[in-house]
């Protein structure tokens, strides 16, 4: 109820892309590095934990925790609430936990159903759009096929969530060559995509309910 009031006539779903929309406004340029954390492939969990919170790698993991603390201190900060909603989603997008040498997949060019794109855009947009469903239809499908499982939130969970995304990222990089066969790629990764979206939704609910 408190969140509904803060977002006025809007909803969590409607505001979830606000963090991307503001990228076109130079006023918000300082937030550009908040959307990702770049980590090399093949690191151990111990190495990952030491790297994930370094802002020099991109500030995504660090800033999720930062925004949670800020909103506890000032629960009425609508801008930070909208940023938090978006960044928790980014935390569950595989290529936002990508490798620095290819800018999270942005410089890996691929062909997708005959059109040129890149690995980052594939996982941000194209793979979802290839389902041929509206966002409402897709959300309804996920709601019907996956149980809501929000957890009692603990701030230590943030790095655990990031590590889970990193595991998916490793699989995505290992299968880059398979993108040329678009339908086969969808078949292989659809369940991975679904699980990532559901994890993100459950974890966002945990944060917002805290």
Residue ranges and their predicted role:
Residues 1-85, 99-210:
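N-terminal, motif-rich segments that launch catalysis or mediate targeting to/interaction with membranes
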Residues 86-97:
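Histidine-centered catalytic micro-motifs
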């Amino acid at each position: 109820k408190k969140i509904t009031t803060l977002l006025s006539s809007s909803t969590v779903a409607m505001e979830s892309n606000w963090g991307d929309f503001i990228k076109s406004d130079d006023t918000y340029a300082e937030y550009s590095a908040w959307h990702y954390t770049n980590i090399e492939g093949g690191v151990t969990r111990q190495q990952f934990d030491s790297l994930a919170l370094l802002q020099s790698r991109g500030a995504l993991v660090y800033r999720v925790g930062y925004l949670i603390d800020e909103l506890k201190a000032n629960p009425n900060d609508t801008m930070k609430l909208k940023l938090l909603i978006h960044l928790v989603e980014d935390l569950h997008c595989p290529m936002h936990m990508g490798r620095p040498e290819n800018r999270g997949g942005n410089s890996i060019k691929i062909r997708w159903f005959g059109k040129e794109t890149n690995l980052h855009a594939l996982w941000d947009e194209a793979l979802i759009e290839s389902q041929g469903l509206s966002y409402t239809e897709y959300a309804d499908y996920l709601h019907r096929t996956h149980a809501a499982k929000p957890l009692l939130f603990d701030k230590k969970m943030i790095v655990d969530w990031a590590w889970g995304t990193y595991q998916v990222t490793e699989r995505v990089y290992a299968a880059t060559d398979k993108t040329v066969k678009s339908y086969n790629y969808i078949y292989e990764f659809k369940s991975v995509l679904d699980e990532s979206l559901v994890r993100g939704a459950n974890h966002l609910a945990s944060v917002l309910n805290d």
